[in-house]
Amino acid sequence: LSEQLVINPDQPRLRLLLARLLFEAQAFSDARVQYQILHEIRPEDGEILFALAMLSIEQADFAQARLHLGRLVRTDQRVNQAQYYLGLVAEKTGDVALALREFAKVDGGYEYLSAQGRIVELISVNQSLEDARSYLAKKKLAHNGLRSQFDLIEGQLLSRVDAEDALFEHLDEAIEAQAGDIPLLYFRAMSGQKYDRLDILERDLKQVLTLDPDNADAMNALGYTLADQTDRYDEAYVLIEKALRLKPEEPAFIDSMGWVLYRLNRYEEAIDYLEQAFERFPNDEVAAHLGEVLWQSGKTRRAKRVWKEALS
């Protein structure tokens, strides 16, 4: 594409394709050059302005990001997205008051709840937890159709500040008022995992699976927990195997299968799955699992290499 543009520089569609490919490849500096050339040709193009804003944020050029986002708002393009990112830019530059004003201007679209989440976080950090919860209480009254989502934001806030008792009290009340709400049930289950309450995790994940029998995430979460924290390995294997059939490419599920096979003393099969998971998603937890199984299998050199790679 670059060679074609040298031969035919006046090909904006070709240049736009190159810019998109560079962006996707995370070649941000090169992508920004191409989008800037396009911007000079099409100064009001919303896609180009938004891409330049995102690239400016990525490179911490917040002044340019504000310019591009401001133009989007003035030309009535991607307004909620632009307002949300103006809020993020203000937050990143330490202007809390401006961030709150910008986030408050997001009045719809996918970004609305994300903006509300940022407002709640900023209030809790810069004012108080109670002020943040009071803000959410008002929002729930004003937007009853979004009560579940606001309850989830409140749960996430309480979890972040480790208010364990308040968290479970809040989630119990929210789920009682909204019986069968899967996101809230799943969040309470994961909160049970965080605070070593296996009884809560198991009860809520089983309830999720009653409501949504093909919920692969719930199957995997329950199966992995049973494999990791109990000796109910056969039950765990059945759950993880079914989850993996539903999402065969999911690295977390592949890791879970490797871990339960290890618990079942099927070491070679476990290594095969864990190596697949590590190749797709080489994070610390997968590395710890693979390293442990290799070590217990007597393959200590390979285990050390895996741990070293994860640390680097």
Where are these regions (language model features)?
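Residue-level recognition of tetratricopeptide repeat
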Residues: 11, 20, 45, 54, 79, 88, 112-113, 121, ...
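Structural marker of alpha-solenoid helical repeat scaffolds
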Residues: 7, 41, 74-75, 106-110, ...
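TPR/TPR-like (Sel1-like) alpha-helical repeat modules
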Residues: 107-111, 295, 300-312
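TPR alpha-solenoid repeat register
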Residues: 14, 48, 82, 115-116, ...
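Alpha-helical adaptor scaffolds
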Residues: 54, 190, 217, 221-279
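Structural signature of tandem alpha-helical TPR/SEL1-like repeats
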Residues: 2, 25-37, 59-71, 93-102, ...
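Canonical tetratricopeptide repeat
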Residues: 17, 51, 85, 118-119, ...
